[in-house]
């Protein structure tokens, strides 16, 4: 999910990373209520009742990349590509829904979301040690950096860093 003004850039990122079509595209109205989502920038609007919203877009990328179907890679570098998309989202004031596959480190996840209120509430209700954090609930189940090395090894060192604008 990303600011609506970044829609064409997001389509280009999908082209470069996955080239999967059709895409599920839908607008999201994000309210600035002090939660985990960061709101701000030129896509922010004030409504008549005084509430602040940000118009975002979301892309659902579902399917098999053509490179995988055409055997371009022995092992499609999915972890590396998702990490590049996550970096693009962080760089463009976007976020990844927590129901998606995520391969972010704890620090990367914290950079993507505003944890101010969340941490305040966890402290107030003494959650530390009793309940897992959002990251702990949604973190990668694989060792991301070990998997990235495996992707590179299986692909015979094929460089797969796509520079997204």
For each predicted feature, which ranges?
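Activity-critical C-terminal alpha-helical subdomain
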Residues: 52, 69, 77-165
């Amino acid at each position: 999910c990303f600011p609506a003004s970044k829609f064409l850039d997001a389509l280009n990122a999908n082209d470069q990373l996955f080239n999967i079509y059709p895409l599920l595209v839908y607008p999201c109205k994000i309210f600035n209520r002090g939660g985990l989502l960061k709101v701000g920038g030129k896509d922010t609007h004030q409504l008549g009742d005084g509430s602040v919203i940000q118009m975002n877009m979301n892309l659902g990328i579902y399917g098999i990349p053509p490179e995988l179907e055409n055997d371009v890679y022995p092992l499609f570098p999915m972890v590396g590509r998702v990490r590049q998309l996550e970096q693009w989202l962080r760089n463009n004031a976007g976020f990844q829904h927590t129901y998606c596959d995520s391969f972010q480190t704890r620090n990367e996840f914290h950079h993507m979301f505003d944890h101010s209120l969340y941490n305040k509430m966890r402290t107030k209700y003494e959650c530390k040690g009793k309940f897992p954090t959002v990251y702990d609930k949604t973190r990668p189940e694989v060792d991301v950096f070990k998997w990235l090395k495996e992707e590179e090894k299986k692909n015979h060192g094929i460089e797969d860093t796509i520079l997204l604008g």
